[in-house]
Curated annotation (Swiss-Prot):
One of its GO terms (cellular component) is cytosol. InterPro entries: DNA_mismatch_repair_MutS, DNA_mismatch_repair_MutS-lik_N, DNA_mismatch_repair_MutS/MSH, DNA_mismatch_repair_MutS_C, DNA_mismatch_repair_MutS_clamp, DNA_mismatch_repair_MutS_core, DNA_mismatch_repair_MutS_N, DNA_mismatch_repair_MutS_sf. Keywords: ATP-binding, DNA damage, DNA repair, DNA-binding, Nucleotide-binding. PROSITE patterns: DNA_MISMATCH_REPAIR_2 (PS00486). The gene is mutS. It comes from Shewanella sp. (strain W3-18-1). Pfam families: MutS_I, MutS_II, MutS_III, MutS_IV, MutS_V. Belongs to the DNA mismatch repair MutS family. This is DNA mismatch repair protein MutS.
């Protein structure tokens, strides 16, 4: 059944009419419909929930003549089920009973009070603690894309204007949003294929004028000039869609979203999607976090510090002043030993960033206030530890920590030491905070003494020794007497409940007291909830200052973490140079050295204006890929302000890092391994500059020998002579080792290995010059290839080598390649390249077509 079809509602029961009407308003998400102690799902929602959550699918009678498929979950277990759903990209509308069942005529009044989507989560139980939870929107213009991300759990709002599809792909890889909004006419759906939470939105939600009005209203400004984003038209359209979506789902004000930042690619080293993937920065090739750069560098004290570190890793700085400011701060923390006590103090702060977001949305829980109270109480001690530091960047961060004595004192007075998880049952507001609340609680809490006295008095009056006075939530207060003695009860005892061996009674006196106590409990709880809401009003005026405190604490955490990692892992402070180049002495791969069972062999690299390309040769498993990756990772670490695994490192200006390392079939896009390889190569050749660091590994291996050799040769030549990029070019084509003899700035290096009889020992040491051979058969033997196959391969190798020596003039394949004449100029192609089709009339275009036919 199509549950959003409301044309024939009259044939359904009143309750199902209510359900179907609400479902029509939330047709693209599951509707959790509260019925007593359960959330129920019906029709297609029930079937889908049963499939996704593994819960039973049943039926609830009939409505409109048809059985109603139904599934349900207990209300007290809802958070666990919500967590499962949002992890797979599913959104949920939660419909609660807001009317009183006792007074309702017909179905109890219900209302959707909360919408849970993957990208708008703020509940601590549903969020990944150490990962940003980004909602994104993308809008495609005639030229380029607008991209916006918003972390509702922190208030961080960022936009970017992107010129190309490749830039958008890189941003998607960098930000890794959990939910993406896109317009109806978005033309690059292939880029979104592997994201779970995709939402197609109507075109009007991306309207420019509407977007501007939404943003101005949100920030309370007359224009957007102060944010430096007035000309970012496409990304502002995406940002407007985000704001509309968040307002629709949160259904409250969003005061913690009070600024918007423009991400400018020119401010950071550009890392394309392939590079982020190949270097395994925050996610390994299997999709996990183990054995990534982030896993090695992250020993932060707080979750908010961990999230900031990952953003830094994906956004290495280009401005040397910003990098040096971080380095200076880390150096001082290290030399003074301040990082050790600072780490412990920050650990006690908790995740203030997300707590402040929940406060702003008024969804904070009692324990959030208790954690904020603890964080504020730690501020004097934290500032005392930092007072010995003089690095300008650290001093600036300390200024943002602020002082909040009034807010701390308020929370000390208002919240009990160990509050319950929820406000709904009371027990959150401390005794002495409000006199009226204390009075109502006194009436309720005095009930125990009263009941003890009543029980003793009634036993004495009636002579019934089995008499007890008790209470439960269903029947209230009662006097309980055994069945054997029930005939002795006085006439004023009114039977309330009959059990197997007991009778329960109520008296007019006990009934009157019950009403008084229950009334006081209800009034105490209502007043406590009112005082709870007032706490939000008293804390929120300091929202912006508390957010600044959270950001400063997170950055201090990252810097302190860098100091600890440098000390623990033996890292040194890299030197920044104005001259193009990368000089690393005894560099180590930061990840491999941590997981390797044997001592890591450190290696150098030298790249500069006169030495721009290294042709890297050596056996498989010899360490070529590890060597190349470590150069890129050390360079990246230097640009986030982190110390690096080396004895010495001098790093010049870098604008981009490219890696073409490893490849596999892209089945989703229908691209072969070779096609993926060539696409990545084309991206490098089009976008690399003289300030780029390029890693190229085994170009051309996915095609025939001569095709592959030709492509590898030409790519290396183009990088060396046309672009002049700093390049590590690993290859098994030994013909490429002749390049240094033919081109300036190109040098050979190789990974050493020692052969002994039929075995090989990998030395993993980088040496100048070309490798003597590839040792392919020995590696195959180590891998367990059968001895018969190895023997046959040796025989075939001898035949091939013998034949090669007999070739005419003993020319190498590359000499043959170089001897080929330059292709003749094609007049038709020359003519075509000179044409601007936008300037042609239809008649001119037709005449030109005939001329091109003649020239060809």
């Amino acid at each position: 059944m199509n549950v959003i079809d409301t044309d024939d509602l009259e044939k359904h029961t009143p309750m199902m009419r209510q359900y179907l009407t609400m479902k029509a308003e939330h047709h693209d998400m599951l509707l959790f419909y509260r019925m007593g102690d359960f959330y129920e799902l019906f029709y297609d929602d029930a079937k889908r929930a049963s499939e996704l959550l593994g819960i039973s699918l049943t039926a609830r009678g009939k409505s409109g003549g048809d059985p109603i498929p139904m599934a349900g979950i207990p209300y007290h277990a809802v958070e666990g089920y919500l967590a499962k759903l949002v992890q797979i990209g599913q959104s949920v509308a939660i419909c609660e009973q807001i009317g009183d069942p006792a007074t309702a005529k017909g179905p109890v009044e219900r209302k959707v009070v909360r919408i849970v989507t993957p990208g708008t989560l703020t509940d601590e139980a549903l969020l990944q603690e150490r990962q940003d939870n980004l909602l994104a929107a993308v809008y495609q213009g005639k030229v380029g894309f607008g991209y916006a991300t918003l972390d509702v759990s922190s208030g961080r709002f960022v936009i970017a204007e992107l010129d190309t599809k490749e830039s958008l792909e890189a941003e998607l890889q960098r930000t890794n949003p959990v939910e993406i909004l896109y317009s109806e006419d978005f033309g690059e759906l292939g880029l979104l294929s592997h994201f779970k939470g995709k939402r197609r939105r109507p075109e009007w939600e991306f309207d420019y004028d509407t977007s501007i009005k939404l943003l101005l209203a949100q920030f309370g400004t007359k224009d957007l000039h102060g944010f430096g984003i007035s000309d970012a038209r496409l990304s502002l359209q995406a940002a407007g869609c985000l704001m509309q979506y968040v307002k629709d789902t949160q259904r409250t004000t969003l005061p913690h979203i009070n600024a918007i930042i423009r991400f400018n690619q020119a401010d950071s080293i550009v890392l394309d999607a392939a590079t982020r993937r190949n270097l395994e920065l925050t996610q390994n090739l299997a999709g996990g976090r183990d054995n990534t750069l982030a896993a090695v560098l992250d020993n932060t004290a707080t979750a908010m510090g961990s999230r900031m570190l990952q953003r830094w890793i994906h956004q290495p700085l280009r401005d040397p002043n910003q990098i040096i400011a971080r380095q200076t701060a880390v150096n001082e923390l290290l030399k003074t030993g301040t990082h050790e006590p600072l780490h412990e103090q920050l650990k006690a702060l908790g995740d203030i960033e997300r707590i402040m977001a929940r406060l702003a949305l008024r969804t904070a829980r009692p324990r959030d206030f208790a954690r904020l109270r603890q964080a504020l109480s730690l501020l004097p001690e934290l500032q005392q530890s930092l007072s010995v530091l003089n690095a300008p960047h650290t001093v600036k961060l300390c200024q943002y920590l602020g002082e909040f004595p009034e807010e701390q004192a308020l929370l000390e007075r208002a919240i009990v030491d160990n509050p319950p998880m929820l406000i709904r049952d009371g027990g959150v507001i401390r005794e002495g905070y409000n006199n009226e609340l204390d009075e109502w609680r006194g009436l309720s809490e005095g009930a125990s003494d009263y009941l003890v006295q009543l029980e003793a008095r009634e036993k004495e009056r009636t002579g019934i020794n089995t008499l007890k006075v008790g209470y439960n939530r269903v029947h209230g207060y009662y006097i309980e007497v055994s069945r054997l003695q029930s005939s002795q009860v006085p006439l004023n005892y009114q039977r309330r409940q009959t059990l197997k061996n007991m009778e329960r009674y109520i008296t007019p006196e006990l009934k009157e007291y019950e009403e008084k106590v229950l009334s006081s409990q209800g009034k105490a709880l209502a007043l406590e909830k009112q005082l709870w809401e007032q706490l939000f009003d008293l804390i929120l005026p300091k929202l912006h200052e508390l957010q600044a405190f959270a950001r400063a604490a997170a950055e201090l955490d990252v810097l302190s973490n860098f100091a600890e990692r440098a000390e623990t892992l033996g890292y040194i402070c890299p030197q920044l140079s104005q001259d193009i180049g990368v000089q690393i002495d005894a560099g180590r791969h930061p990840v491999v050295e941590r997981v390797s069972q044997t001592p890591f062999i450190a290696n150098p690299v030298t790249l500069h204006n006169q030495r721009r390309m290294l042709i890297v040769t050596g056996p498989n498993m010899g360490g070529k890929s590890t060597y190349m990756r470590q150069v890129a990772l050390i360079t990246l670490m230097a640009h986030i302000g982190c110390f690096v695994p080396a004895e010495r490192a001098v790093i010049g200006p870098i604008d981009r890092i490219f890696t073409r390392i490893g490849a596999s079939d892209d089945l989703a896009s229908g691209r072969s391994t070779f096609m993926v390889e060539m696409t990545e190569t084309a991206n490098i050749l089009h976008n690399a500059t003289a300030q780029s660091l390029v890693l190229m590994d085994e170009i051309g291996r996915g095609t025939s020998t001569y095709d592959g050799l030709s492509l590898a040769w030409s790519a290396a030549e183009y990088l060396a002579q046309q672009i002049g990029a700093m390049t590590l070019f690993a290859t098994h084509y030994f013909e490429l080792t002749q390049l240094p003899d033919l081109m300036a700035g190109v040098y050979n290096v190789h990974l050493d290995a020692i052969e002994h009889e039929d075995t090989i020992a990998f030395m993993h040491a980088v040496q100048e010059g070309a490798a003597s051979k590839s040792y392919g058969l020995q590696v195959a033997a180590l891998a367990g290839v059968p001895a018969k196959v190895i023997k046959a391969a040796k025989h075939k190798l001898q035949q091939l080598e013998s034949r090669d020596h007999q070739l005419e003039g003993t020319k190498t394949p590359i000499q043959t390649l170089l001897a080929l004449p330059e292709p003749a100029e094609n007049p038709a192609l020359t003519k075509l390249q000179a044409i601007n089709p936008d300037n042609l009339t239809p008649k001119q275009a037709l005449d030109l077509l005939y001329e091109l036919k003649r020239l060809s």
